[in-house]
């Protein structure tokens, strides 16, 4: 009984903390040009070079994560928003104002929290972190809601062509070295 009560109190504490983090973000931070979504600390190495290349530009950048340990991984002087609850993370995704959202997470609009924003001007870019095929290695519709997908081999290139054809999409393919 005490364990259950402690668990409930911990969840309530997380909700309250996320509420104030999100409120602070809304009041003080405003819109961003690019938002990098780091699902957890393990995805940072795949986005690190892209983030560093974007720092020198005069555009506002935000790093968003659900992993509270991400701050220890990142030594860059960038704003970091951490929302640990799915509830506030979903609200963040639905209301974000940015030109680009860059992520290594698939299943945009088909997962529990990773949703497209109500702001139709935001472009979603998927950064590849695996050499596996896009059709056999992921869920069937894992990429159909992205605007651009990084391709790192010829198999992924062919898979992306097939996905575009099957779902009548025009998802851009690009290579990043």
Please provide the spans of the model-predicted regions:
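A nucleotide-sugar donor-handling region in carbohydrate enzymes
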Residues: 7-19, 142-177
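A generic structural signal for alpha->beta connector loops
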Residues: 58, 77-79, 121, 146, ...
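Hydrophobic/aromatic residues located in beta-strands of well-ordered beta-sheets
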Residues: 60-61, 124, 149, 173
